[in-house]
């Protein structure tokens, strides 16, 4: 169903008001929160201060106090499968990431390439109007590619 025209059409174009809303890209709501994922390798769950650990992490603690902390996520002990889980919300074997990408063997659930139909969080956020940015090592493509 098409949206009703929200502009005004008068006798003269100078007195008319166009409606560009059907052609505008999606935008995140004005009060939408920022989403920040921080992924670290080789850090135990309880190592940082915000989780009761012995390492002093005042900046991370401050971010954690103002945001949401996830304590019931499943990740793996390997970087590629963990990143694929965080990006898609799916189990690493559903993402064909049974191991790190250098060890991908090309068999089902172990090809080292995330199937496009799994979708990724940046795509979903982008469709809803958020801008996304990634920096750092991702390790999500086999070396043969």
What are these regions (language model features)?
Residues 1-145:
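Formylglycine-dependent sulfatase
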């Amino acid at each position: 169903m098409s949206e009703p025209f929200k502009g005004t059409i008068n006798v003269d174009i100078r007195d008319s008001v166009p409606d560009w809303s059907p052609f505008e890209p999606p935008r995140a709501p004005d009060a939408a929160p920022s989403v920040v994922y921080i992924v670290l390798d080789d850090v135990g769950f309880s190592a940082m201060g915000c989780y009761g650990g012995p390492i002093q992490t005042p900046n991370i603690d401050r971010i954690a106090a103002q945001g949401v902390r996830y304590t019931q996520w499943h990740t793996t002990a390997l970087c590629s499968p963990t990143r694929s889980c965080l990006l898609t919300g799916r189990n690493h074997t559903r993402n064909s990431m049974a191991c790190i990408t250098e060890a991908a063997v090309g068999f089902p659930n172990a090809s080292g390439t995330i199937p496009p139909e799994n979708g990724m969080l940046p795509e979903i956020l982008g469709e809803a109007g958020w801008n996304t940015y990634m920096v750092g090592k991702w390790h999500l493509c086999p070396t043969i590619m």
